[in-house]
Every structure is written in structure tokens, then in C-alpha cells.
Amino acid sequence: MAKIRVYELAKKLNMTNKALLTKLKAMNIEAKSHMSSLEDDTEARVRESLHGMKNKQADTRVKSSVIRRRRPPKPEPSVTELPDDEAAGSNGAAEEKITTPGPVTGDEMTETSTPAPVKSKIPLKAQTDSTNRPTPEDPVVKATELKPKKVTKPKSSPARVILRPDTPAKEEPTKAKEVPAAKEVPAAKEAPKVKETSKAVNVSEDEVNPLPTKNVELNSGDSKPDGALEEKSETDEKALEKEPTIKQEDTILEDNHARKEVRSVAVDDDDKNLDTAEAKDKKRKKKKVQKRSEPAKIIKMAVPISVRSRNKVKTEATQAPTSPQRPKVHPKPADKGPARAQAHRPDTGRDAVVLPGEGDGEVKRSKKKEWKKKGVGGPGVEFAPKGAPRKRKSVVEGKDLYEKGRSGKKGRRKDGRVKKTKTMKTQITVPKAIKRRIKIDEVIELSELAKRMGIKANEMIVKLMGMGVMATVNQTIDFDTACLVAAEFDYEVEKASVEEDIVLQVQEAEIDPDKLVSRPPVVTIMGHVDHGKTSLLDVIRKSKVATGEAGGITQHIGAYRVKTKKGTITFLDTPGHAAFTSMRSRGAQVTDLVVLVVAADDGVMPQTIEAINHSKAANVPVVVAVNKMDKPGADPDKVMRELSEHGLLAEDWGGDVIFAKVSAKTGKGIDGLLEMILLQSEVLELKANPDSPATGHVVEARLDAGRGPVATILVNQGTLKAGQPVVCGLYSGKIRVMIDDMGDDVEFAGPSTPVEIVGLSGVPEAGDEFVALDSEKDAKQVSDSRMQKQRAKVLAKRSRANLEKLFESMGADEIKELKLIIKADVHGSLEALNDSIMKLAQDEVDITIVHSGTGAINESDVSLAAVSDAIIIGFNVRPTPKVRSMAKDENVDMRFYDIIYNVINDIKAAITGLMPSTFHEVIIGRAEVRDTFVIPHKGLTIGGSFVLEGKIARGFKVRLLRDGVVKCDSTLSSLRRFKDDVKEVAHGYECGIGIERYNDIKIGDIFECYEIEERKAQVEQIKE
């Protein structure tokens, strides 16, 4: 048997779930919730119960005795009225027992239409037509004229049941056509098919509404009265055409008390005494004023009626506008009176009975004041659409509140819903000209540029593709590309004003010639490796620096300050090794004078030529020191001759280059060299301002285990003081300690003074410029700005490199890779190692430096090497025992060096091992076939041959050539000289040669014996 849910049955019966559950409970049918299931017979019982009661309702009518029984002074159950405030609270949801279309019975009319009073027996119809036909101010709905077949369910909670009449009175159904129609608020044309939300009705003692208040869908075009009501509606429609408007005074009752207190009016045609009705009316007014406690919240919502009912109202109003027997209620609030709309019937259910409220007089007045402010109730607008906005309740979605066309009649369809309007497409606002200018750095990410311009990144990528630039969202583009693509979108790009330049320009004071003083010269000693540069400097400084150098060679720049009898000289000792090109270049840039050391017995070497080029590029004068004059094979003329070929012509030969012959071993010529240096510096007129902010260059930098980043700097201008904020390259800090070249702490350093400083935030690069600032905050700002630019450049470089490698590697074999982690003691050595190692990269093997830095090898380096499968190279650094143990556990290879030669040679050996071998063919010998012999029992053909060159030997491959074409490539099966098997046959001898699986040997063929030789790739070794 099929079952049905309670909520489904309620939907079919046009009832709320709560109302149906109440009905089921009254019928002793078990249903716990709206999801409970009901049998078919149960559904039939419910339908029969509801429909049967409705049929009775059409045949009976409430008598006046019922009303008198419902009028106690207190809200007792005997009262059958529900005040407007309670009806408003339910808002039409009291219609618990809404039935399908059918005739309305008297029982149902008695129970559901509780506010409807019994009609009086006064022969009003005989006296005047205005008493049995509602005037324009009569807000009573002629419900029988409305089509009861279109029933709608309200969406609010049902009204509370106060009392069900025990004995509903019976009355002829023909009386229904005499019930006056209610006031029409919205016209049928204005709100077609609008569902009515009935209002609570107050009942006077002598007036009764004979019809139940149902939620009826009112449509002037669709509503048709039943039976005898149709004739009356047609008559009313004709009357409406004759009188289209009603004067305002017709809507006001003569009795002011009746305007204030009476809440509903129904005109009876019963024979009742008018005086008695008026007396009881006044009696009831006092009771209602005392008992009302809540305002009529939905007083403004009116019941829409059909056009026929409206016509009847207007017609009857013109016939007897001032009749004293007309109802004591106004249809709507007038401009002057406190009267309220009376015919707003509540949407009560079958069992609902209206209870009068208390203390609603003040509420009435306040409501009427609001209506007056809104201008409701003027002349000619008795049926004004004041209740139109609230005559139908519905669920409104949040998005509907923001759509246009949601209010007014034009935006509504015939079914009462609002038409959906097309949403407008978002308009792109064009920024002002001043805002179409973007400031960027040297590089910028594509997504960031698109964000600043307010466009989509995809559109920018399309433009770049059209310009021939393949870019991704996260890829960086340079300033020029950004300018071009921004111009496509009518944007202007300019470089951001560098904040650091503004800060640094403030520090740069104008050079005052009066404050300039002479400063010591900065001399850089350059030359080829092992030509005695450091030894010469040791003699000058009277120290033993060279003996402490690993391998006897200098591997980083040393800055020293030497005091002589004639003045102070600052020396910079640079490496002479080929790997330290950048150091020599940097030394030449920060120096005033270059001393080129050349060994008298060795002459000009490659690094000597390089030093000459660096000096010329820096436009620095050169003084040549011919060293090792104490050796037997010393030839200074040879040195002068070779240097003249490179543009350095000695003064003795008519040039301008000073030559000094010295011996670092014996000390010969040292004083003369110093005199020449000071003489040259006087010619240069070297001066500086010690009072200006300190500036200079970083000569060397390293990471000390105990002190942190340590930088060796050379002050060019001004005076550097301890505790002063400085900026060195990408890093900044406050100077904590300053140490001179002798290891002593100093408080200040003047021009041309080399010192070591401690306190920077990181290890700067050698050659970076440093500037002393007044504020540590400014120093940090400049440092952060430089760091940001550096990161952007690195990111752009990586992005381009990745794309280039991707295109190169497409379709190519996998390239082997040697990964390294390099740690060095100073930044200069680290830089030299990186440059030298990267030059060793081959096409078959790529070298990747995963990480490089200064300082000791730590645990993080070992972890990184374990993850990336890299080799750790330590240059002049050693790990701690804990790091060694960790490297052993992680199986990480660590190598330690003190001399750069050994590092480079080992790297070359590793590259050689990774490079694939090549195979070469080596011809061992050739032999010509002079005759052929066939061995029948073996099926072999032997070629009698003569060895033309080389030798023919077993174990090698052999090929047969005929007219230069290879006919066979196989191995020797037989090699004999006469009848003896031999291992090989030398040049000029004859032999018999047989080839495996080949017998087509002819006279004149050539046997060629060869082997395939595997050759390992070789990388040139650096000579120690």
C-alpha cells in the first residue's frame, strides 16, 4: 500500500504542516512530525473530514446569539474574536484547514470565520441600499463574490484557537449575496493574482459577517461569483462605470467614537433595531479599549477584492452616503480621523476564534499618524495601494535585494513574482593619467607588473608573445621589456627613484679645496707567480709574510701600512696566480700606483702581461721592479726588452716608466724603489678630506668563527670611526671593532689606511664600496634596498637560464653533473675558486656549485651535501670532529686543500672520470691477396697475401676491401706462414689468411687489420 508523507499531504491540501498535524491529532491519528508517513485510508479520512466540514459551512450561518456569548470583559474562551494584533502576528497563517475548491458549509464558516458576527434582523435593505451594500469606507470583503476555488496557503504560523462555536447557526445561503464587499486596496490591474493575507476583524454586537475569511487568490480577471452572486456583481460593475471616484467625506463616519474603536463592520439585512445596535456598539468600544494590549501590526495590509465588489461598493456609497444606519467603521485611515481599516479579516483556520486585545487605542492613533505622513487616504484614493507592499509575504533571497526592477508594478509579472533583470557587465574603469605611470626597479615579475597595471596576467602574456617574448606568470622581465609591454596598455614605466641614492647623496659633501690634505699613496704589488712579490714586501715591512703562505704563494690580498723615512706607504699584495685575475683587477682599481715585479731570470710571463693590462685599464701609473738580481742568470735587459713590446718603455730607453733593480733576498735596491714610489706619488698630488664622511673599498672579507663577518677595508676619503654605521655592499652594520695591519685596536682610520672591521650583518664581496652614514636606520634601509634588487636579479637570471637550458636539453642526451659545495677562509679565495672551477666545465659534464661561502664547514653544509649529492671542498678551512662524524654517517665526501693548484687538478680528474670515453680505430696492418686456395674438407677459402704495411695479427678485427668497398668485416679464422700457425706476420712477409664465415676472396682484395681503442677524455692539468 502506498504511503504519503505529512508534508506532502499538507501541500496537496494547501495547509501548513503544523495545521495538518493539529488536525491529525484532533482525529486521533498518530503523526510525530511532518516526515511521518500516512496510509491511503488515513489520507482519505483527512480529506473527508476537511471537505465535509466545508460543505456544511455553505448551508449554515452564525446567529447573533453566538456573538453575544463571546463578549465578556476579559479575554475568556467564550469570546469569539481575535484582535488585529493577534491576527497580525499570525499574518494570515491561521488558515490551518485550507480545503480544495468547493462549497463552504455553515459549520466551517462558523469555526474559521470567527470574526464574522451574526447579521441583525434590521430591515436595512428596505430603508436604504447603503445599509446592505458597503460604502467606500466599508472594508468588509464580500467573500462569496470571490472565487473560492483558488486557495493559497499563507506562509506564517496559524492563529491560536480560542473557541469553537458549539452550535453554529443556520441561515439561508441566499443571504450571502447581500454581504457588503470589503474595501479594495490594490486594484485588480495593479496586483493581479495577489494572495490575500486577511486581517483580524472586530465584531460589533449587532453586526455579523456571514462569510468565512479565507485566503483567496483575488484576480479581477479570473474571479467569478457562484450562483446568484454573479448577477449582483454584474450590476455593481455597471454602477462603477457611472461613478469612478468617491469623495473623501464619504469615507468618514459621523460618529467619532465609532471611527476610533470599531474594528470590523458587516451590514445585515436582518430585522434589528438600530438604536439597540448603536447602544451596544458604544458598550463594546469601551471594552476593547481596555483589553487591547498589542498593536495591529498588519493594519496597513488590505484585502484585495474583485472589480465587481469594488463597483458595488462605489454604487451603494453614492446612493446613501450619509445614512445613519451605515456601519460605524471606516475602511482606511482618513486625513483627519483616527479611524482604521475595518474589513481586514484574519487568516484564521477552522478552529480559530478572534480574541479582542487590550490597550490598542494609542497604537491606533500612532498608526494613523504614520499613514497621514505617508499621504494615505486622500480624496479619490479610498482604495489606495497602501497595503500593496505587504499584501503578500514571500521569501526573498539576499541576491534579490540588489537586483534592479524588484519594486513597483512594472517589475512584476502576472503571477506576482518579480522579473529578473539582466545584470550589467562590470565596466573597466580607466585610471587617471597620473595613475598610469608605474615605477619599477631594474627587473620585475610579470604578475607583479600586471597587478600594478590592473590588468590580467594572461593579457600581458599574450602581448609579450606577440612581441616575440615567451614568458610565464612568475617569470621576471627587465626594464626595457616592461616599458614595451606597458606601452601596449597605455601605461608609462619609469625607474623607481632609488632611495639609497637619496640617502647617500646627503652624505656626500662638496669637496672643499681648503680642507684637502696630502694622503699616503696606495701601492699594489703585482706580477707573475713566484716572481718574489711577497718576499719584496716582507723586506719592506721587515716581516715574514711569505714564509706563512701555503705553498709559498699568496692566495688573497693583504693590505699593509709601511712607514719610511720619507713618508708612509700603503701596500696591497695581490696573488700572482692565474686564478686570481679578479683580485688583481680589484687591486688595480683601488690603488694609486702599481709596482710590477718581474724576475730577472724568468722575464715576462702571462700574469705579468695580465697585470700590465689591468694597470692600463685602471689608468694607473706603473713602476717596474726587476727582482732576483742576485741570481747568476739574471738578465735585466731582457726584461726591459720584453716589457717594451707591451708598451712599458724604460726611462733609460727614452720612455716614462721607472725601472728599479732590486733583490728581495739581499735587500739591494729597496731604498731606491721606495724613493721612486714616493716621487711618483708627489707627481700625482694625492689629497683627501679627512673631515668628510668616510668612503672606501672592501679589499678582502671573510667569516671568522669567533667574531663573525670580518672585512678588510681601505679608506679613500674621510675618517672612519669605531661605532659608526656603515654600508658595505649588500650588508650594513655598526662598527664594533677596528684593527690595523699590525693587529692593534684603533678608534679611527684616516685616508689611505687599511683596517679590519667587525660588526657587519654579512660577509661583503671583495671590491664592494663602503660608506659611513649618520643613522643606523638609514644604513639598514640602503642595505634592504640593495638586497631586494639583488634577489630580483638572481631570480631573473635563474629564470632565463632555466628556459635556455630547457630548450637546449630538448632532444639531447642526459648531461652528467658534478655538484660542489665550496667553503674558503676569505672571500677573495672563494671567488677565485669559483671562477677557476666554472671554467673547467665541459660539454659532457656540467659543474654546479650548490653553495659557496666563507667560514668553517658546518653541519648545514653536510646536510645540504647529503641531500644534493655534492662534494664538499674546504680551502684553508677544517671541520670540527662533530661535523666529520656527521659526514661519515651521511656518506658525504669532503676534501681539504691549502693550495689552489691541487683543488683545480682534482676537479679536473673528477670531470675526466665523469666524461664519456671516446673510441678510435687504429689500423694495425694491410695485406694484399696474391692468390687463393680452397680447402675442400673444411669449405674454406684461403687468401695467399703479402703484408704491405704494419702487421697482421690474431685477435684483431679484419675487414676485406675490394676496390675500396668493404665486403666483409669479421675476425681472422686462420693465419699461417707456410704450414705453421703464427701469431702475427710482419711487414714484407707472405702468409695465408682465412676469414670466419666468408669465402668470397678474390685476387687483388685487401685485408685490413685494425682494433678499436678506447680513449678517456683529458682535461689539461695546471702545472704546479
Swiss-Prot record:
Compositionally biased intervals (Polar residues): 316-325
SUPFAM superfamilies noted in UniProt: Initiation factor IF2/eIF5b, domain 3, P-loop containing nucleoside triphosphate hydrolases, Translation proteins
G3: region residues: 573-576
Composition bias type Basic and acidic residues, residue spans: 43-62, 135-148, 167-198, 223-263, 332-350, 394-406
InterPro entries attached to this UniProt entry: EF-G-like_DII, IF2_II, IF2_N, P-loop_NTPase, Small_GTP-bd, T_Tr_GTP-bd_dom, TF_IF2_bacterial-like, TIF_IF2
Keywords for the protein's UniProt record, in alphabetical order: Cytoplasm, GTP-binding, Initiation factor, Nucleotide-binding, Protein biosynthesis
Gene Ontology CC terms, in alphabetical order: cytosol
Keyword Protein biosynthesis tagged: yes
Domain named tr-type G: residues: 518-687
Residue spans of biased composition, Basic residues class: 365-375, 407-423
Superkingdom as given in the UniProt entry: Bacteria
Reported function: One of the essential components for the initiation of protein synthesis. Protects formylmethionyl-tRNA from spontaneous hydrolysis and promotes its binding to the 30S ribosomal subunits. Also involved in the hydrolysis of GTP during the formation of the 70S ribosomal complex.
Protein name per Swiss-Prot or TrEMBL: Translation initiation factor IF-2
